[in-house]
């Protein structure tokens, strides 16, 4: 099995509803997002997929989140914008990509959440 990964970044603000602590208040992150795609076999030119294609797809999703207050966006009006839920949201937006394995969202250098099916 082969796996490849692309990374991209976005900045946004959010607050965690129902959380008792500092993250209940409005705050921001410079998020790093990793998209991992896998394949049992390489394509005819020896690749899982084109990195540029994957970066373009990922950036198209992240552009909708960049410099936004996530709680005000449609999906996150009902779903708490935790790292876990952001990872799932991005995964679902990219679900049409052949071989998608996982999306990992880093909210800091030391803390991340991964969604995979």
Segments predicted by a language model, with ranges:
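Charge-rich, low-complexity N-terminal segments
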Residues: 1-117
